[in-house]
Amino acid sequence: MSALRCSVCSAPLHPDGRSLRCVRRHSFDLAKQGYVNLLRAGVDAGTADTSEMAAARADFLATGRYAPLVDVLARVVEASGEPEFVVDAGAGTGYYLAGVLDRVASAWGLALDVSAPALRRAAKAHPRIGAVVWNLWEPWPVADGVADVVLDVFAPRNTAEFHRVLRPGGLLAVATPGAGHLRELVTELGLLDIAGDKTDRIAESLGDHFEPVDVDTASHTAELDADEVRKLVLMGPNAHHLHRGGLGAKLDALTGATEVTFEFDVSVLRRKE
Ligand SMILES: C[S@@+](CC[C@H](N)C(=O)[O-])C[C@H]1O[C@@H](n2cnc3c(N)ncnc32)[C@H](O)[C@@H]1O
Ligand SMILES: [Zn+2]
């Protein structure tokens, strides 16, 4: 709570019954599901994950297939010293932030995401998570220099705000899909090419504000049953394109197991002064 700022006037926010309020009496309702919406304006349709995508994401992540990425992120947070506050930008259902907080008992976490259905889940994912609906492209409703670590897992990157909310010397971890991520499904199902920016491109784009510390890659393969493949596809951007190339029909027709490659790159950067 002490890290949050009013999205109208930037004053600190305080709990007041079922809302958060600043000294100028700007007020934001706490949803009964445990998150707060600080947005003042709407966001473009199609930006936020839908409740179907959030449900598919929660179900798929519960299989543990992406657990190696939690390990990498937790190691980054542990390496930051004795972290007290971790911000997850585009936290989705809170899976990664909750996994990190399980490992780092000293820290509290803030989940920022524009998707209310995803944040309902994030708010319940861990007792030390606070969840705020926000558009990452706007200045964040977060005080200067309060975060020990910012996580960004497959989410939009706002360099200026990463820098502003991090303390001096704080760490930024940017996770992106590696070159081989889900390559079997890209071939067999014709998925959108989900490969993220190359890590040198990420370091370059953040270079004015951050110096690169490390790039960690985690990769493994697993046999997925048809139901897991469906969830994996429906939790991401392909969910918006089920008619393209008959993707929906291909998913319906799936039976048996598919070998799938998972590959994650995590760029670790340190905030420059
Ligand atoms: C691919 S998902 C990743 C979610 C989570 N980090 C994970 O890996 O499970 C991208 C997330 O970014 C969120 N998102 C997209 N654009 C956003 C924006 N402008 N502001 C805030 N969140 C945004 C979506 O709602 C979604 O939860
Ligand atoms: Zn205010």
Residue ranges and their predicted role:
Residues 46-72:
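Class I SAM-dependent methyltransferase Rossmann-like catalytic core
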Residues 147-161, 176:
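A short SAM/SAH-binding and catalytic strip from SAM-dependent methyltransferases
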Residues 138-149:
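A short acidic, Gly/Pro-enriched loop at the edge of an enzyme's catalytic core
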Residues 1-47:
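N-terminal auxiliary segments of SAM/dcSAM-dependent transferases
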